[in-house]
Amino acid sequence: FKIIELYGFSASGKSYKAKKIVSKNKLNDSFLNISTKNRFFRFFYKIFFIFNIQILDLIFITKIHKFIKFSDLIIKSKSIFSYLYVIGFIRYHIKKNQSIIMDHGLFQCLYGSFLRSPNNMILDIHVAFLFNDYLKNLLKNSVFIIIKVKTNLTIVKKRLFKDKNYQKLKFFNKNRIK
């Protein structure tokens, strides 16, 4: 059983690279196809996977969110929902013994939390230890591969501007990413 997660900045080409990997390997690509569905369908699709969550998962999500400060409740709620969906999706496919590829997994959830927190701060190094301990439990008897998607940041900026994703453009400019 194999889980492949692609990690990188928004508009960096994660989905594109994931589709190339799917065509070469026998992987479940349902995670990649959800973005093509309408918002109503996506919501209920994600709820289906959340039912696979276990108590250990809820404890992990709670602990992670104690260390991350969000500017408002809506952003925090979206972050929690994202973690629930991703973990539920992984648990479901572990039960089915299906190898999967994800262009927005646990590390992307953490990265998103970082981007949405005031001053881009995650308050404690314990987050790394929490992730490490949790992944050992969640992914035992599995192969977990993380692929960092490298990209041309000029192209990413153009895509973000075209998509009117000003929050992430602001992050680029604030941190002088060139």
Where are these regions (language model features)?
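Hydrophobic anchor at the beta1->P-loop junction of P-loop NTPases
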Residues: 6
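Conserved phosphate-donor/acceptor-positioning beta-strand/loop module used by diverse small-molecule
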Residues: 102-105, 124, 128, 132, ...
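ATP-binding Walker
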Residues: 12
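ATP-dependent small-molecule kinase phosphotransfer cores
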Residues: 38-121
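Walker A/P-loop
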Residues: 15
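P-loop (Walker A) phosphate-binding loop of NTP-binding proteins
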Residues: 9
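Short beta-strand-centered segment that lines the nucleotide-binding/catalytic pocket of NTP-utilizing
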Residues: 27-42
